[in-house]
Curated annotation (Swiss-Prot):
One of its GO terms (molecular function) is tRNA binding. It catalyses: GTP + H2O = GDP + phosphate + H(+). It comes from Homo sapiens. Residues 48-55 are annotated as: G1. The lineage of its organism: Eukaryota, Metazoa, Chordata, Craniata, Vertebrata. This is Eukaryotic translation initiation factor 2 subunit 3B. SUPFAM superfamilies: EF-Tu/eEF-1alpha/eIF2-gamma C-terminal domain (SSF50465), P-loop containing nucleoside triphosphate hydrolases (SSF52540), Translation proteins (SSF50447). Member of the eIF2 complex that functions in the early steps of protein synthesis by forming a ternary complex with GTP and initiator tRNA. This complex binds to a 40S ribosomal subunit, followed by mRNA binding to form the 43S pre-initiation complex (43S PIC). Junction of the 60S ribosomal subunit to form the 80S initiation complex is preceded by hydrolysis of the GTP bound to eIF2 and release of an eIF2-GDP binary complex. In order for eIF2 to recycle and catalyze another round of initiation, the GDP bound to eIF2 must exchange with GTP by way of a reaction catalyzed by eIF-2B. Residues 190-193 are annotated as: G4. Residues 134-137 are annotated as: G3. Residues 39-248 form the tr-type G domain. Belongs to the TRAFAC class translation factor GTPase superfamily. Classic translation factor GTPase family. EIF2G subfamily. The modification Phosphoserine is found at S16. PANTHER family: EUKARYOTIC TRANSLATION INITIATION FACTOR 2 SUBUNIT 3 FAMILY MEMBER, EUKARYOTIC TRANSLATION INITIATION FACTOR 2 SUBUNIT 3-RELATED. It comes from the Eukaryota.
Amino acid sequence: MAGGEAGVTLGQPHLSRQDLTTLDVTKLTPLSHEVISRQATINIGTIGHVAHGKSTVVKAISGVHTVRFKNELERNITIKLGYANAKIYQLDDPSCPRPECYRSCGSSMPDEFPTDIPGTKGNFRLVRHVSFVDCPGHDILMATMLNGAAVMDAALLLIAGNESCPQPQTSEHLAAIEIMKLKHILILQNKIDLVKERQAKEQYEQILAFVQGTVAEGAPIIPISAQLKYNIEVVCEYIVKKIPVPPRDFTSEPRLIVIRSFDVNKPGCEVDDLKGGVAGGSILKGVLKVGQETEVRPGIVSKDSEGKLMCKSIFSKIVSLFAEHNDLQYAAPGGLIGVGTKIDPTLCRADRMVGQILGAVGALPEIFTELEISYFLLRRLLGVRTEGDKKAAKVQKLSKNEVLMVNIGSLSTGGRVSAVKADLGKIVLTNPVCTEVGEKIALSRRVEKHWRLIGWGQIRRGVTIKPTVDDD
């Protein structure tokens, strides 16, 4: 924060001012101007097969290149969850035809600016602030995609126009978002500049046949070229018109699901200048404020002398809040938020805190080490290329003592099946997880050296452990 009175944001003076002293959370909405001026309130995931243009679409809408890491740039694939915020504006001149009256910019742009379209007058005004969760499309990275699905409110399904539909990961991702109960989907037929009109129409029919009977049935199909930014304003218009802003809970105790964490200190930094770790994630409910005391669960996990799992919650204080480059005094649900804390940075470096839950002290859910779930298995394996017209392999039933990968919220952990009966199963988790009864979980099994989505479950009950507290 750039100095000044406590509790008032002074960074980015061209954005709406936030004042903690006059904050009344009961009056906030996901479209309150002081909220969407600085942070996104809706999360949109990009899903689809590898190299179909997910990251390029995010760049076309937000101006942010989500591929950040050297090995990602070299191989031109997304490996970690990318993220970018974008503001969507609408021109207040009714004579301007659609879709030209919609425009998108990065999150630090002013909230209104004059029109530059010939023959129109008025200003472009901010109508939505969205956060894109850019998921990897590679089959080895399915776990990362499921972690991203935990925070999505809607999805853009990308299908490249120059390849047949569906590709293996397209169907696997679509199954994953059905599990996560995502209702709002836009289908983008990308790379339209590379194909002739006849091919595009043929593929349009393929897409319609592919989504029939799935959660994406009836979703709008928009032909675009992300590289040439063709039809991107139509995507913006559909985001505003077709994707409702989800109802949010501003008054409960805050809870944030961590999907990234980092140590922001440079090597060789002086001890006095060290900053605490930063956790990045999406607030599920409540409002986080600068200066608030927080707890992170499960926290530090260890084993006692008998090999039993123990957890120690991490307590800290929020030093700063930010959404991309915008300082915040308080952060509302939705959108990806960075939380600067006083936690030892070594606990946060390189995404070590992913899967943890951060919230108000004493108000977080239980920590589970074993889960009893009611589960549902897919009939056939998805995401595997099959020769010719052979059908994919059937999903075998769960067997006792087999090891699965379990995705709960943003945590991927191993789990050993300890008992199975009809559609109920007991799973002993490798890592403890902070979650609640009724939460959805995704199950994956190792097939030919890759983790493959095989089904999902719902937590019915489980074995919990109490976090230990230091005596000092």
